[in-house]
């Protein structure tokens, strides 16, 4: 097994970004074999192997382009597996916690950044208490050196205070220790994120009124300034949920409607409709569509696609300028074009045209193949609808503005000439041609 670790890590050889995914997948295969040892009652042996594996991954950190974070994520899984194996093997929990802390302290590559979020889920109760005690001791030591200021925010404390404060909060959320979390906020100040977490702790305990009070507090704090990464975007949705649980469905619906009017989208539409009585669904659906249509094009398209309102979507697409569609991401338009193509070909063609134009206007040559595919769809749909002039207008625009994009225009002209799309040669055909070329002397 040690040989398998050594072979998979291949220390001394650099792993490029393009190879990093396959490299980590090979590491995962080895990890699965060690995981199996734990299940088969060989936890002690597994601990030794995990130990080598973790250290080996750290040795490899300088020999891999881990821009995608694959090795870092794998390390976190491996670290938690090592903890679980130590616990199953009945190793000293105090020693386990000390090793965890040392890894977190000696973390030159950031593999242990916020690793406490998963660690506390793996640690047993005894180990969590030891971990909490150690972090609390560090926090109190760092906090004791800080000059107190009434208006001080958590983000204004020194790094040692903030780091251990953050870890303590993670521990208290996982252990559902509301009182300890509240005491910590009393000492260091409360952020909107804290309010959301405390509200969720009360919600889990079905103390909905207490939860709602903390949501209200968080929303008030949000208005008092910029909280950066301590801002909370989940408070409004949580408030709707709590109002509903408290029997205040109408208030929850009113709040959902206010949010929908600000940001019409699939998500806000779903939230709104969950709170609507069955007999009022049609009314609220039409109301939401009307508001979205007058507020945001992408939101309106998303909702129409979700609810299959193809007629309304087709009418709206036909009434707007091409430039408006060209500003939208393909995430908003691609599903709409596919859905409209069956019965509303003209509207679908307009969207496909806009999708193609968006790519070539930006000049992203690596996406030209997608632009050509969009134009091919548009050509067929315009022709099927008997609106050849619209296709001709599009062709004139492309030729006039983008004829110097040589890696694109030649293939576009093939579409204009209605030349069939060439099917790529099969692998076998290409390989046999290459064999013939390699084994045949020129005349």
Go through each PLM region and give its residues:
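Eukaryote-biased, non-catalytic alpha-solenoid scaffold regions
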Residues: 1-443
């Amino acid at each position: 097994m040690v040989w398998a670790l050594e072979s998979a890590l291949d220390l001394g050889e650099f792993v490029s970004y393009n190879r990093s995914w396959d490299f980590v997948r090979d590491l995962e295969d080895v990890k699965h074999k060690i995981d199996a040892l734990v299940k088969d009652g060989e936890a002690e042996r597994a601990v030794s192997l995990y130990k080598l594996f973790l250290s080996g991954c750290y040795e490899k950190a300088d020999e891999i382009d881990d821009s995608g974070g694959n090795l870092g994520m794998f390390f976190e899984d491996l670290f938690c597996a090592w903890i679980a194996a130590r616990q199953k093997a009945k190793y000293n929990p105090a020693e386990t916690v000390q090793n965890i802390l040392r890894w977190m302290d000696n973390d030159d590559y950031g593999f242990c950044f916020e690793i406490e979020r998963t660690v506390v889920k793996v640690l047993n109760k005894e180990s969590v208490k030891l971990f909490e005690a150690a972090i609390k001791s560090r926090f109190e030591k760092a906090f004791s050196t800080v000059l107190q200021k009434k208006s001080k925010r958590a983000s204004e404390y020194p790094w040692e205070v903030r780091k251990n404060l953050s870890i303590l909060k993670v521990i208290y959320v996982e252990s559902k220790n509301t009182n300890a979390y509240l005491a910590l906020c009393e000492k260091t100040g409360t952020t909107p994120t804290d309010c959301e977490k405390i509200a969720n702790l009360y919600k889990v305990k079905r103390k909905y009124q207490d939860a709602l009070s903390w949501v209200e507090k968080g929303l008030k704090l949000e208005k008092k300034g910029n909280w950066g990464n301590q801002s909370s975007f989940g408070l409004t949705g949580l408030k709707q949920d709590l109002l509903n649980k408290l029997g205040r469905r109408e208030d929850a619906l009113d709040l959902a409607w206010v949010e929908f009017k600000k940001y019409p989208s699939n998500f806000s539409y779903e939230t709104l409709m969950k709170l609507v009585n069955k007999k009022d669904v049609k009314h609220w659906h039409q109301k939401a569509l009307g508001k979205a249509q007058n507020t945001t094009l992408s939101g309106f398209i998303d909702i129409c696609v979700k609810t299959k309102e193809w007629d309304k979507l087709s009418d709206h697409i036909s009434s707007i300028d091409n430039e408006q569609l060209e500003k939208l991401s393909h995430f908003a338009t691609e599903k709409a074009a596919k859905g409209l193509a069956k019965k509303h070909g003209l509207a679908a063609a307009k969207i496909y045209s806009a999708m193609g134009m968006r790519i070539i206007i930006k000049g992203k040559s690596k996406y030209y193949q997608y632009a050509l595919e969009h134009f091919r769809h548009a050509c067929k749909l315009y022709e099927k609808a008997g609106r050849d002039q619209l296709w001709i207008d599009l062709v004139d625009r492309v030729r006039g503005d983008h004829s110097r994009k040589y890696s694109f225009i030649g293939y576009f002209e093939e579409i204009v000439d209605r030349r069939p799309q060439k099917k790529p040669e099969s692998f076998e055909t290409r390989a046999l041609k290459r064999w013939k070329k390699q084994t045949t002397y020129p005349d």
